[in-house]
């Protein structure tokens, strides 16, 4: 499967992790293995690798959401969460976080199309950022508490 740290398809294990960080503290809270769709469809291969029959393919964003929900059920409060474009490019993930009233800052692919709450399409990120002047960029404060 694709191994991001190696930059190529490789024999590797891919995991999804949930981490918690403050200026003074950081730790991994939870993690789960990602089983590629090709593996999930090949049950004899899974059995040979010791993967139980009940383990099925789940997209990484769904695994991340399950880890998040479990942490929240255990009383962990996240003021903000961040993620890379592998998750930010999945509208289902963004909608699920919004439905949970979770604040987030995420990377999105340059081909991502942004939209408004009423379904209005703004622009693809690539074209929107190309049109923006250097003076239009600013740091946005993210202070406040959701917990």
Residue ranges, per PLM feature:
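Active-site-proximal, Lys/Arg-enriched surface segment
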Residues: 1-35
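A short local loop/turn or secondary-structure capping micro-motif enriched for an aromatic residue
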Residues: 36-40
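An internal, acidic/charged active-site-proximal segment
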Residues: 41-147
